[in-house]
């Protein structure tokens, strides 16, 4: 039967329902779910340091490159777009990139490194190979041997990325790569590296830093940020395919080693 409410303003109060007691829990209580680990700490803009070297015009009768200097400017632009401070970036272009200046620049990276810093070393230019060894070819032909380069870069504390763009570039990873030091190179130790006159960059640096990073074509998971591995995975097969018909030396196959996790330029882990 429906309950009729009069117009007297009185309110009908229903009897409370009786809720039976809950049965006791059977078995052990479920274990708490583990919380995801916090993200690794990242180097602040104050703790990011870069030495960028690019040589197009060499002293004397050494043949010029197409993209050495442009590569250096490209890398700098990508870093600035990712929040790096201009006063933490040292540029050595053409006549500035003497053998002495490069050696001093590597000592500068060492001196400014600490357990909380991230450091980038980038070289784009000629590489000389002799007697099974590789040499960075500075503007003034004051060659820097691979053993000296590796020794200097191994002295960097914190985490680091060393990027070499030149012929036989992977030869500079002579014990340099480690879980805290990523190494990338434009070609294997027995391969040449090439340049693209249409873009004005070396093939590898243009595809990695311009297409992969700056244009974000390497952003495979579409999260708006391109990691080094994403950019490398985008650029490496394209560089090899782009140079596949080069004769007599054949294509270049980019090289990657070291590192213990994703590397993002906007928040490099330390």
Region locations from a protein language model:
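Boundary/activation segment at the start of structured domains
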Residues: 3-120, 126-129, 134, 265-270
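Short, well-ordered coil/turn elements that cap or connect secondary structure elements
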Residues: 45, 84-86, 155-157, 178-179
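Caspase-like (clan CD) cysteine peptidase catalytic core
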Residues: 47, 103-124, 128-174
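Active-site-proximal C-terminal subdomain of hydrolase catalytic domains
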Residues: 54, 79, 93, 160-250
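Short, glycine/charged-enriched secondary-structure capping and boundary segments
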Residues: 65-67, 105, 134-137, 175-180, ...
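Stable alpha-helical elements in mature extracytoplasmic
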Residues: 68-75, 98-105, 145, 149-152, ...
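Terminal, contiguous helix-loop blocks that mediate binding/assembly
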Residues: 80, 241-270
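Residues that flank catalytic or metal-binding motifs in active/ligand-binding sites
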Residues: 132, 180, 204, 259-261
């Amino acid at each position: 039967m429906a309950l009729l409410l009069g117009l007297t303003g009185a309110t009908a109060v229903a009897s409370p329902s009786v809720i039976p007691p809950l049965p006791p829990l059977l078995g052990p209580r479920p274990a708490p779910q583990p919380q995801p680990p916090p993200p690794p700490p990242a180097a602040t803009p104050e703790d990011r340091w870069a030495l960028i070297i690019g040589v197009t015009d060499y002293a004397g009768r050494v043949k010029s490159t197409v993209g050495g200097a442009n590569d250096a400017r490209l890398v700098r632009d990508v870093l600035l777009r990712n929040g790096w401070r201009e006063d933490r970036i040292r540029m050595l272009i053409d006549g500035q990139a003497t053998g002495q200046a490069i050696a001093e620049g590597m000592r500068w990276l060492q001196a400014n490194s600490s357990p909380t810093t991230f450091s980038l070393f980038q070289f784009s230019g000629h590489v000389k190979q002799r007697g099974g060894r590789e040499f960075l070819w500075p503007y003034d032909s004051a060659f820097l041997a691979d053993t000296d380069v590796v020794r200097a870069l191994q002295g960097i504390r914190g985490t680091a990325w060393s990027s070499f763009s030149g012929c036989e570039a992977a030869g500079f990873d002579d014990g340099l790569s480690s879980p805290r030091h990523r190494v990338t190179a434009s070609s294997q130790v027995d391969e040449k590296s090439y340049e693209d006159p249409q873009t004005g960059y070396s093939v590898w640096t243009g595809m990695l830093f311009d297409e992969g990073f700056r244009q974000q074509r390497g952003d495979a998971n579409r999260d708006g940020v391109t990691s080094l591995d994403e950019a490398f995975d985008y650029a490496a097969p394209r560089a090899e395919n782009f140079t596949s018909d080069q004769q007599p030396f054949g294509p270049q196959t980019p090289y990657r080693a070291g590192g213990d996790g994703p590397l993002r330029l906007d928040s490099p882990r330390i």
